[in-house]
UniProtKB/Swiss-Prot annotation:
<keyword id="KW-0561">Oxygen transport</keyword>
<protein>
    <recommendedName>
        <fullName>Hemoglobin subunit beta-3</fullName>
    </recommendedName>
</protein>
<feature type="domain" description="Globin">
    <location>
        <begin position="2"/>
        <end position="135"/>
    </location>
</feature>
<comment type="function">
    <text>Involved in oxygen transport from gills to the various peripheral tissues.</text>
</comment>
<dbReference type="GO" id="GO:0031720">
    <property type="term" value="F:haptoglobin binding"/>
</dbReference>
<dbReference type="GO" id="GO:0072562">
    <property type="term" value="C:blood microparticle"/>
</dbReference>
<dbReference type="GO" id="GO:0005344">
    <property type="term" value="F:oxygen carrier activity"/>
</dbReference>
<dbReference type="GO" id="GO:0005833">
    <property type="term" value="C:hemoglobin complex"/>
</dbReference>
<dbReference type="Pfam" id="PF00042">
    <property type="entry name" value="Globin"/>
</dbReference>
<feature type="binding site" description="distal binding residue">
    <location>
        <position position="57"/>
    </location>
    <ligand>
        <name>heme b</name>
    </ligand>
</feature>
<dbReference type="InterPro" id="IPR000971">
    <property type="entry name" value="Globin"/>
</dbReference>
<dbReference type="GO" id="GO:0019825">
    <property type="term" value="F:oxygen binding"/>
</dbReference>
<dbReference type="InterPro" id="IPR012292">
    <property type="entry name" value="Globin/Proto"/>
</dbReference>
<comment type="subunit">
    <text>Hb 3 is a heterotetramer of two alpha and two beta-3 chains.</text>
</comment>
<feature type="binding site" description="proximal binding residue">
    <location>
        <position position="81"/>
    </location>
    <ligand>
        <name>heme b</name>
    </ligand>
</feature>
<dbReference type="InterPro" id="IPR050056">
    <property type="entry name" value="Hemoglobin_oxygen_transport"/>
</dbReference>
<dbReference type="GO" id="GO:0004601">
    <property type="term" value="F:peroxidase activity"/>
</dbReference>
Length: 135
């Protein structure tokens, strides 16, 4: 994936202006409400963003996003350790959608179309890398 300097700067804006843990936990909470079948993998979750199990999983998602952010030019090789987990890759896309909604809610007017496009590109790269690793 080719990144322009502007796209990288826009992804950095999102990364630097958000509380990663809170945004991801809220996105997970939204995921479990909007797409309840995704809870199949998380039988111990009550689905609320403040729940300790959701917070713990949000931390794992934040770690994966941080890894991708730190290696934005070459994400896929850094996700090799996820191989063999056998999770439905579509769930990553659904979470990415919920994350976009949460970012829009959090950043309000700062979540411009340009910012949204750059973040969407980033999340698509992450989803693609995870999907290949989990198959």
């Amino acid at each position: 994936v080719h990144w322009t300097a502007e796209e990288k700067a826009l992804v950095n804006v999102v990364w630097s202006k958000t509380d990663h843990q809170a945004v991801v936990a809220n996105a997970l909470g939204r995921l479990f409400v909007v797409y309840p079948w995704t809870k199949t993998y998380f039988t111990k979750f009550n689905g609320k963003a403040g729940d300790s199990t959701v917070q713990t999983h949000a931390g794992k998602v934040v770690s994966a996003l941080t890894l991708a952010y730190n290696h934005i030019d070459d994400v896929k090789p850094h996700f090799k350790h996820y191989e063999g987990f056998h999770v439905d890759p579509e769930n990553f896309r659904l979470l990415a959608n919920c994350l976009n909604v949460e970012l829009g809610h959090t950043l309000h007017k700062e979540f411009t179309p340009e910012l949204h496009a750059a973040w969407n590109k980033f999340s698509n790269v992450v989803v693609d890398a995870l999907s290949k690793a989990y198959q």
